[in-house]
Amino acid sequence: MDDFKKFELISDYKPAGDQQKAIDEMVNNINQGIQRQVLLGATGTGKTFSVANVIAKTQLKTLVLAHNKTLAAQLFAELKEMFPHNKVEYFVSYFDYYQPEAYKPITDTYIEKDSVTNAEIEMMRLSTINSLATRNDVIVVASVACIYASVSPIEFTKKNLYLHVGELIEFEQIKYKLVQLGYERKDYDLVPGTFRIRGDLIEIMSGYSDKFKIRISMFGNEVESIDLCDPITNNIISKEQRFILRSASEYIFDDSRLAIAIENIKNELDERVKFFLKNNQLIEAQRIEQRTKQDLESIVEFGFCSGVENYYRHLEHREPFQTPWTIFDFFSYNNQDWLLIVDESHISLPQVKGMHNTDRSRKQTLVEYGFRLPSALDNRPLNYDEFNKKLSKTIYVSATPNDEEIALSDNHIVSQIVRPTGLLDPIIEIRKTEHQIDDLINELMLLKNKNQRAFITVMTIRMAEDLTNYLNNTKIKAAYLHNELKTLERSVIINKLRKGIYDCVVGINLLREGLDVPEVAGVFIFDADKPGFFRSDKSLIQIIGRAARNADGKVIMYADVITQAMQTAINETKRRREIQLAFNLKHNIIPKTIIKPIHEDLSGHDYKQNAELYAAKASKNEYNQKIKELKKKMEEAAKKREYEVAAQYRDMIVELEAIKQSVKSK
């Protein structure tokens, strides 16, 4: 390790409710050598804060696994705020859009791979790997896509340029090494992964950060100084005595290894063509020969080709069926101890289980019909057994853990039931389905009169649409939350619910992240007695938890019979509520509804509407002040790497500037 720092948790809050007990128990389990445990934390008990305390107390490098990019981004923002002096990294798929290569034999349809990569996320991935290779105080927040193949830590750590002040090294040698590391020479604007030469100065923008550039000053063949500079102002950020520069991208293949890989690909191609000819599959033989030879020509000339990942087994010199390298190997490199946090484990683990089989099924068809060599099957995610073998100390975090996590942890379950706010799990009522709509409207009117909101969950899209339309023809203002909405569009609807523009939101899947709304005092579950995933005991407990942010929280289930799933959910909620009540009585705590700020809507056309609304009300003197405020917010969002939010602030500024100009011209 080049840099040793301790994890330092910075927060205005101290553990409260059940948090301290849970933190102590988890830390004690880790210190006693217990490899796996479950944090069974009720909704709203501050599980992320407890996990952050465990990281600070154990001082272990940590990987936090989330089941999607949105949740990963939320966790990344929270942990970055709590650990401002440590490295908190974001490691998700760098594709903004991805259509995998596929073949459908029934219709003889070949679907070519199509993708759009995100350069910013690609840089963040490389930053993650670099941090893991050089520091000990690293927290990585990743999506489940991190089980896909990555670069070998052995190869990555080999590829570097190490320089120190006073070192004797030829100018040409530095240039040669930079090119070997994948850096491209540019004479003008530097972007990540490029360098330029100006007299005795070499300026490099690393592949893993755009926050600084490295300026190397040479005096003949001697390194005179190494400065980290601001890429825009050129001001010196820090003077370094030594610096290690890592490669410009995840995968860099040197010429000698490339030559061996190409020879091995040719040998595999010969064997595959013989196989197809032997089985009288002439079309497949011609197809695999033509496609592979085209790829090889491109690799020889440019060092890559479209779909180069299908040749990674050869390019990395791995054996057939060998477990691929992943981000996990950077944590365990040099036999280091580390910590894995599986967030929402009841969703994340099933995803991990399914990814390998889905990937293999698609590629197997490509191999059988001559679109890919069999070695393409080795460019894959970890299977579930490999995933479990990679793990070190693990905490499965969930309000409703599956039997899988409980078995893996050998029943080492840490409970976190009491909320720091003293809020209780909601009261549950069961009502018959007869006249359920009339009953719902009566309940919604009661909530509306108290300035409270509601979530309504139904089983079908048709029911959701019909119910929303019906409610909107009454005195109730309703919105329909469906899965085709983008993340930011969903947050606009939730914000409008919080502001009282809507009285309720109707949806099918109310288990997703971002639905913790303190104004919601009523949750209504239609068809509670119907079988299916959305009415399982665990799903019901998650839905019930949506009413646990409000002191008046209540859940009404519409059902004609009480199913086993319903009874289990009711019993568990009752058990938790009794524990919470007892704690509150003992400590004289009065439950209070959470006060949570409502952020500005910055999605879709809302920024334009907000700008025009502001312009209609603003005086000329206020324009500049408002734009100044928005620019500050944009810069703050960019610093937190909330780039989507920053972009929306930028659009709002542009809109205000345009309106300001049009007002001036009138």
UniProtKB/Swiss-Prot annotation:
Annotated compartments: Cytoplasm
UniProt domain Helicase C-terminal: residue ranges: 436-598
SMART domains recorded: DEXDc (SM00487), HELICc (SM00490)
Pfam family, one: UvrB_inter
InterPro entries recorded: Helicase/UvrB_N, Helicase_ATP-bd, Helicase_C-like, P-loop_NTPase, UVR_dom, UVR_dom_sf, UvrB, UvrB_inter
UniProt keyword Hydrolase present: yes
GO terms of biological process kind: nucleotide-excision repair; SOS response
Record flagged with keyword Acyltransferase: no
Residues of the UVR domain: 624-659
Swiss-Prot/TrEMBL keywords: ATP-binding, Cytoplasm, DNA damage, DNA excision, DNA repair, Excision nuclease, Helicase, Hydrolase, Nucleotide-binding, SOS response
CC annotations in GO: cytoplasm; excinuclease repair complex
Its job: The UvrABC repair system catalyzes the recognition and processing of DNA lesions. A damage recognition complex composed of 2 UvrA and 2 UvrB subunits scans DNA for abnormalities. Upon binding of the UvrA(2)B(2) complex to a putative damaged site, the DNA wraps around one UvrB monomer. DNA wrap is dependent on ATP binding by UvrB and probably causes local melting of the DNA helix, facilitating insertion of UvrB beta-hairpin between the DNA strands. Then UvrB probes one DNA strand for the presence of a lesion.
Subunit structure of this chain's protein: Forms a heterotetramer with UvrA during the search for lesions. Interacts with UvrC in an incision complex.
Domain description: The beta-hairpin motif is involved in DNA binding.
Family stated for the protein in its record: Belongs to the UvrB family.
Protein name: UvrABC system protein B
Species name: Ureaplasma parvum serovar 3 (strain ATCC 27815 / 27 / NCTC 11736)
Gene from which this protein is expressed: uvrB
